[in-house]
Regions:
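Trp/Phe/Arg-rich N-terminal binding region typifying the photolyase-homology
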Residues: 1-57, 145
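Glycine/tryptophan-enriched, flexible segments
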Residues: 48-167
Length: 168
C-alpha cells in the first residue's frame, strides 16, 4: 500500500541526510505476522483471527507506552523536509470531537447503528493518523462490559493485516 512506499521514501531521504530512522508499531496492537494461523499463513477470515487476537491479548496484556510527556523532545525546526513534500496539504475540514467515554463504549452495541443516538466514538480519523492511542482504546474496550467495541478495533487490525498480506 501507499503508506509502505511513503515510509521507504522518507527513510531514504533521512538516510541521505544522515538522520536515523526509527520505525515503531503504533497504530495496531499486533501487526504483520504477529497473528497468523498455526502454519504461519495469514488469516483470511475474521472470526478465527479475532479469537487468536483475543487469546493473545488475554495472555500478554496490553502494553502501555505513555508519550504525552515526550512531545517537547521533538525538534521544532526541521530543514530536511516539510509536510507538503511528503504528501500533506492544508485542509479546512472540521473533524468531529471524539468521545471514548464509558457510556459510549458500554452502549456501543445498542446505539452504533442509529445516527440520531450519537452512539459512536468518532475516533476513526484519529486512529488513522495516530493522534489517539490504539492501546488505550483497546484497554478501555476490554475493561468495559461490552465486547462489540473491542471487536470493531480487532476488525480494524484484521483489515490492516489483509491489506498488508494481500495488497492487490
Amino acid at each position: 500500500p501507499y503508506s509502505i512506499k511513503r515510509d521507504h521514501i522518507i527513510k531514504k531521504l533521512l538516510n541521505e541526510n544522515k538522520i536515523e530512522f526509527f520505525d515503531f508499531k503504533d497504530h495496531v496492537l499486533y501487526e504483520k505476522n504477529e497473528i497468523v494461523k498455526d502454519d504461519g499463513m495469514p488469516y483470511k477470515v475474521y472470526t478465527p483471527f479475532s479469537k487468536k487476537w483475543i487469546n493473545k491479548m488475554n495472555t500478554q496484556g496490553v502494553p502501555n507506552y505513555p508519550s504525552e510527556n515526550l512531545i517537547e523532545k521533538l525538534l521544532s525546526d526541521n530543514n530536511v523536509f516539510n509536510t507538503k513534500s511528503i504528501g500533506f496539504t492544508k485542509s479546512e475540514i472540521k473533524f468531529l470531537k471524539n468521545d471514548t467515554s464509558s457510556e459510549i463504549i458500554n452502549n456501543y452495541e445498542s446505539k452504533r447503528n442509529f445516527p440520531s443516538s450519537n452512539g459512536t466514538s468518532k475516533v476513526g480519523v484519529q486512529l488513522r493518523f495516530g493522534t489517539i492511542s490504539t492501546r488505550k482504546l483497546i484497554k478501555k474496550a476490554h475493561e468495559s462490559n461490552n465486547n462489540t467495541y473491542l471487536k470493531e478495533l480487532i476488525w480494524r487490525e484484521f483489515f490492516q493485516q489483509i491489506l498488508y498480506h494481500f495488497p492487490r
